[in-house]
């Protein structure tokens, strides 16, 4: 079957950053119906809820809008007078509701040009759903200290067929107190922080990356970049991991196949590489019944790709404007569909007005991207890809010379098979993104692995079935002189199996489906293990325990 047919359930898309409340921690079992009805459980994830510090807090409404088209909400932000800071934590919360019929839609929110939220929406039931998302935005404290312009957009289409209006409210809650120190120097998902002079979790400055050159403070001693990289917004880049070279008879083409790599450069020189996360949106794999209650990993939490650019700080500290640019390797020339808004997070040396140093090492391997097509029944595309980059530099700070070395290694393998007409379409894929950051005697090693294993089939009876497994894993170890190694492990998995009658009105689909969402996190401070299971839109298990 043509990709346009089999993927017709996924049109425009979007993404959300944050954690949905997981609900009750006790096991729970409701009796599911024989098939999906006109209503189902509100969207929920197994992600851990955010902790909130005790003490005084203040709430500010950041945006409130009903999105019917592509008109952005524009407003203004003023810091809370009753909670002037410092802030131990700032929590963004999005509350949404929608009913009727609608696709999943892509959205983002900026304050003074700094993107602090990227989000997508769930698909509604005819009777209506509500959902809530929370995100820790403490790292944007520099932006939130000052009044600024707010812009939010969740592009939507409302007409006689697609009736769902997206009603959204976004708030910020400011918890007063001193922010905690960061757990380590790596960019593996925790709050930033490191030994010696930059053990502060919250950066001193946050600068949006735009088309214009950027000028950084001359006493910058640590520099991260974050990129909210999403392949979405229509066209085949919404499911880039399924694209094939031009020679293969498949409906989604990309001359170089499915390998993608998010790159950041400074003044035209490669400064960082990363594997994009293969997000499956809430209409993905031709089957919205997989996602109505439990979205896949990160589908409601667009986490930015993060780079440690500290080796380049000496070059940027000259007081002159510099070009910082983001690109996605593997995207066909002229092809749209990727969004890569980026921010720079900077820590300053408060003991020195100017920090000098040098970039001392820049070494990369030749990028590998080898898609091999084999004709037959089924057709098959085997792809391998990879790249490695090492950069090193030093800074002469007020607390001595500090050398930072960053090594990033990417590896990808996938096997994509499909039949003529694409009535059967299957993919098994793995992305590895390994990073080592050494600075001031502290080494942080992070091994990230993302997996996808799924198959969609369309039978002679027009029953469309999707069986899919997704994995999001990260293993981070911090080595400090004279101390035991500190390890953090994340293992977030999703499995689903859903079937419905294709090409008929919604009330004739006779859909059935089961899903399991399990989030496991083990840190030096303890563990978290939460499992959600659904059947036909009913939550049949909600259990926690390590």
Where do the protein language model's features map onto the residues?
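Flexible, low-complexity coil/linker segments
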Residues: 151-223, 347-398
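Extended extracellular/luminal ectodomain segments enriched in beta-structured repeat modules
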Residues: 82-91, 216-224, 235, 405
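Beta-strand-rich ligand-recognition modules
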Residues: 30-49, 53-74, 78-83, 87, ...
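A short secondary-structure junction signal
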Residues: 204, 209-211, 233-241
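Feature for soluble, non-membrane regions of globular proteins
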Residues: 90, 207-208, 215, 238, ...
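Secretory targeting and sorting signals
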Residues: 1-29
